[in-house]
Structures are given as C-alpha cells and as structure tokens.
C-alpha cells in the first residue's frame, strides 16, 4: 500500500521515531509538535530516552522532525498516561519519570493531570496539525496497556483505572466538540481490548498477546486503510 516504515534504526533522526512509544502523555505529544512546527523553546537536559541516555535538543533533529511531520497524511496519536512528572519551575512535563541520578526534589514534581488539561492538550494537538498540515487527518487512540507502577499513595490497579478514565473523558470531550469534523477520528483499541476480548494479555498482564494485536490491527485496516 506504499507505506513508509521507520523505526529506531531506519528513517530520519527524530525523537518521535526513536522514542515515540515512550511519549504516552498528551503534554509531550503537544510539546514535540510545538517544538517542530513553531520552534517552541524547550529547556535543554530535560528529554531522556532512558536513565543513561539523554535525548538531544538541537536544530538538526528539529528540522528532520519538521520535514517528517509535513509529509504525514494521517496522524495516529495514542495516549496512555495522565500521571506525569514535571518541572516545578516552568511546569514542563517530562516524557517519563526523572532518572534517579538527575532527580532534584526542589525542581521535580509528580502529579495526576486533569481532564481539563488533557482535553486542552488534545484540542491543541489537533489544531496545530491542521494549521501546518491542513490536508492531514488525525486518529486518536487510548492505549490499553495498564500502569506498571504509580507514585500515588494507592494501589496501581485503582490508579490505572483513574488514569485511563481521565484520558478517556478528555478524548470524549474533544470528539464531542468536533463531531462535525470529517478529519478527526477515535479508534476504540482500548474498548476492544477491555470489552471484547476475554483474555487478551500476556503473562505479564500488561502487553497484548500477538494474536489480539493482529486482530485489532485488522479492524483498524478495514476501517481506515481500504
């Protein structure tokens, strides 16, 4: 079907390819789009692929990201976390938890983001894409992968339920307010996993079994790729 396939080893040097699956909150998705399209100033030394690998914030990567984004016809944006770590000094939200050797209690904080914050971010994500790539479509999805841990003083099971619920309500807010848009969609991968399949997860109880991933992708293909 003439699709371009990129991964960490193949394709342009961009963070959304190298670490796209780690950008699971709405703040970081919006930040990458604002950085690429609008040259938003981002504080250095705040992006991490892993505890030992810092992601570069330089003009070369930004330009490659911009060129890649301008060519996209369909943006598939999956969100999964409403629990976030952030910079107390400027409210910048990080991709993931701060590496232990970089953590500063006075500077770094943890919070459960709100429905309102995520609704606003999702609206802005759609708006900035349409501003700079007007012919593109946007498909939002909610990741069914549950939290592995929480920094809230409660069970990870209950924290995950709250985290997903916040995002699902935010997504519903955006879709309800843009019901007339013909280029904005929600694909229910979360609901298919939770409500349709009876035993979809691997032994780790977090990641989908391969056959269920293929079933979901088949449903997606039938609705969006034909």
Where do the PLM segments sit?
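Extracellular glycan-modifying ectodomains
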Residues: 1-226
């Amino acid at each position: 079907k003439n699709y371009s396939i990129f991964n960490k080893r193949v394709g342009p040097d961009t963070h959304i390819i190298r670490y796209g699956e780690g950008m699971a909150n709405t703040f970081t998705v919006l930040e990458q789009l604002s950085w690429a399209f609008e040259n938003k100033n981002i504080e250095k030394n705040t992006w991490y692929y892993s505890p030992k690998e810092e992601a570069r914030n330089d003009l070369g990567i930004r330009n490659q990201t911009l060129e890649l984004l301008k060519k996209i016809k369909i943006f598939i944006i999956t969100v999964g976390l409403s629990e976030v770590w952030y910079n107390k000094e400027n409210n910048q939200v990080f991709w993931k938890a701060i590496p232990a050797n970089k953590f500063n209690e006075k500077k770094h904080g943890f919070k459960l983001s709100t429905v309102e914050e995520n609704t606003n971010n999702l609206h802005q994500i759609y708006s900035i894409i349409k501003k700079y790539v007007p012919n593109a479509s946007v498909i939002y999805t909610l990741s069914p992968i549950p939290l592995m841990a929480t920094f809230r003083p409660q069970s990870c099971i209950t924290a995950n339920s709250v985290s997903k619920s916040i995002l699902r309500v935010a997504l519903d807010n955006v879709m309800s307010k843009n019901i007339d848009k013909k280029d904005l969609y929600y694909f229910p991968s979360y609901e298919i996993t939770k409500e349709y399949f009876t035993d979809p997860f691997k032994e780790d109880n977090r990641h989908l079994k391969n056959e269920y991933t293929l079933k979901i992708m088949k449903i997606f293909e039938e609705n969006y790729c034909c």
